[in-house]
C-alpha cells in the first residue's frame, strides 16, 4: 500500500538536519519492533491473530451478541484494511457499521492476508496509525512521547502506545494522563491473562508513571533552517518543472 513518508535531509556526515512532511511518518521493519510491543498488540487487539485468515468469526459473533460493548470484533488485519481503503462511519451506530463497513473490511482483510505475511501486516498497521501530536506511525510515536527509538521501548511504554490504538483522541497522554494510565493497565492485564507477563510483575508495572518525554516535532526545528527551506524550494521547483 502507498504511504506518505516524511522526507529527511541529511548532511554529508550522515547527521539528520531536518525533515519535511504532511504526516510525520517513517516506517520501521517488523524486525525492529520490540517483542513486548507485538505481544501487547496481539493480546489486546487480536489474540487469535496468528490463526485467522483476516476475519475472526468467533470475535465477530461475540461483538454481535454484546452489541459491540465487548469489542467490535475487528482483527488487526481488518483495522489495517479500514486505515487503507474503507470509509469511516464514525457517526453511525453499531448495526450500521456492521452492514455498511464490515463486509468491505472482510474482503480487503482477506486479500491483505493473501498478499502479506502476518509480520508484515503488524508492521503496516503500526506504521500507519495516527498517535496524534505529530506522531504518525510507531517510530514517530516512540520519539515524540518517549524520546526513544522503537527498539528501545520498555514494556510499559509499549503498553501505553498499544492502549492508544483503541482511540487515540480519547487516550491522548498529553490531555488525559489518568485515563491513559487506566488503559495501559488494561493492556498489561491482557498480557498477564495470556501468559506474556507474569502475574507477579503486574502491580509493579501498573505502579510506574507514564514517564513521558514529549518531543515537539516541527519543520522549523533542527540546524540550518534557512538552508533547509532554500533546499525545499529548489527541489519543489525542479519537481514542478518536471511535471510541467
Give a label for each model feature.
Residues 4-6, 10-198, 241-243:
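Peptidoglycan glycan-strand catalytic modules in the bacterial/periplasmic cell-wall system
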Residues 198-244:
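Non-catalytic structural connector segments
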Amino acid at each position: 500500500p502507498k504511504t506518505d513518508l516524511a522526507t529527511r535531509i541529511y548532511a554529508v556526515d550522515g547527521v539528520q538536519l531536518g525533515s519535511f512532511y504532511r504526516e510525520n511518518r517513517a516506517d520501521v521493519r517488523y524486525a525492529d519492533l520490540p517483542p513486548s510491543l507485538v505481544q501487547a498488540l496481539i493480546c489486546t487487539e487480536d489474540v487469535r491473530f496468528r490463526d485467522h485468515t483476516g476475519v475472526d468469526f468467533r470475535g465477530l459473533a461475540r461483538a454481535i451478541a454484546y452489541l459491540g460493548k465487548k469489542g467490535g470484533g475487528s482483527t488487526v488485519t481488518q483495522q489495517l484494511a479500514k486505515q487503507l481503503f474503507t470509509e469511516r462511519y464514525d457517526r453511525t451506530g453499531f448495526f450500521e457499521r456492521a452492514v455498511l463497513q464490515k463486509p468491505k473490511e472482510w474482503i480487503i482483510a482477506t486479500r491483505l492476508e493473501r498478499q502479506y505475511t502476518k509480520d508484515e501486516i503488524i508492521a503496516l498497521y503500526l506504521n500507519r496509525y495516527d498517535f496524534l501530536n505529530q506522531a504518525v506511525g510507531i517510530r514517530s510515536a516512540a520519539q515524540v512521547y518517549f524520546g526513544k527509538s522503537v527498539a528501545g521501548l520498555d514494556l510499559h511504554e509499549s503498553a501505553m502506545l498499544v492502549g492508544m490504538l483503541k482511540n487515540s483522541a480519547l487516550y491522548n497522554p498529553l490531555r488525559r494522563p489518568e485515563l491513559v494510565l487506566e488503559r495501559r493497565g488494561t493492556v498489561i492485564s491482557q498480557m498477564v491473562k495470556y501468559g506474556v507477563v507474569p502475574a507477579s510483575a503486574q502491580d509493579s508495572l501498573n505502579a510506574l508513571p507514564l514517564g513521558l518525554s514529549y518531543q515537539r516535532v516541527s519543520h522549523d526545528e533542527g540546524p540550518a533552517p534557512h538552508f533547509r527551506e532554500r533546499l525545499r524550494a529548489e527541489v519543489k521547483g525542479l519537481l514542478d518543472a518536471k511535471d510541467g
